[in-house]
Amino acid sequence: MALTRLVIRDFRNIEEADLALAPGFNFLVGANGSGKTSVLEAIYTLGHGRAFRSLQAGRVIRHDCSAFVLHGRIDDGGGRERAVGLSKDRQGDSKVRIDGSDGHKVAELAQMLPMQLITPEGFTLLNGGPKYRRAFLDWGCFHGERSFFTAWNNLRRVLKQRNAALRQVTRYAQIRPWDQELVPLAEQVSALRAAYSEAIAQDIAATCSQFLPEYALSFSFMRGWDRESDYAALLERHFERDRALTYTAQGPHKADFRIRADGTPVEDLLSRGQLKLLMCALRLAQGEYLTRHSGRQCLYLIDDFASELDAGRRRLLAERLKSTGAQVFVSAVNADQIGDMVDEKGKMFHVEQGKIAV
């Protein structure tokens, strides 16, 4: 699977760009602030419905414009080309078009364009809050199990309703109807996450052993409530506490996926360069797992490739990315930083003040 064409209009500092893309490596080279990250962000937005540097639509729409428009052509790997499009106005209203028809959902774009994002801010996967690691697990569940998205979406809805009800009820019997809906959803989502974390742990360990052979890494999934407790009984037992807090304190919305190096949390032991390498290993392992189990490739978006990595680590990452056979988009300040990746099959774009040239 590869994005063969990308059209960008009024996104960040890019007025208009029409890019024919290589199926392998695509390099975006330019000074800081030139717009190279905006190209990566446009690709990410086309596959997610939102940008990775801002959740507010108005901030990514070009100054004095009412909306941004993104179009893409996808080679699905089976000899079929798909057309996708996304527009969003300053009020946040989106329009999704797939193969010429309107009325589609952003989740359909995400299903068609699985992608892994590696940015200088991506350390949050390792040293940020549990929500970043839940998102990592949920990406894998979403692309690997079709029932996951519906269950996850319903879980979020019921949790929101239960938390609102906690502000109004006085007895547990009044909130039991929400719990009767919440419990099976919580157990379904948790079971899918647990199965995925167990399945991918071996892939992560193998990739990490190549990237960080000096450490013994271990991985553990925590579902968000006590392992020995029945969730329905726990909700009833802690009703008064939840009512005082006005939110549900335990459940799958508190799940986590922890990584330790030699028994110590990685964020307490590894250097920034090692953390970035570990983050890259996690993203690579997840993408390769998807390919092996579904036959589908994901896109890799790498912003500021050289950040935190010395020449040896850059070379190692370049070799692993090449071995995937996936489409890769890489931004760098100058061509010297990506020398280990460049070959005759790749394509280099020079970006300057929102203008993009081959």
UniProtKB/Swiss-Prot annotation:
The keyword ATP-binding applies. InterPro entries: DNA-binding_RecF (IPR001238), DNA-binding_RecF_CS (IPR018078), P-loop_NTPase (IPR027417), RecF/RecN/SMC_N (IPR003395), RecF_2 (IPR042174). It comes from the Bacteria. The keyword Hydrolase does not apply. The RecF protein is involved in DNA metabolism; it is required for DNA replication and normal SOS inducibility. RecF binds preferentially to single-stranded, linear DNA. It also seems to bind ATP. Belongs to the RecF family. NCBIfam families: recf (TIGR00611). This is DNA replication and repair protein RecF. The gene is recF.
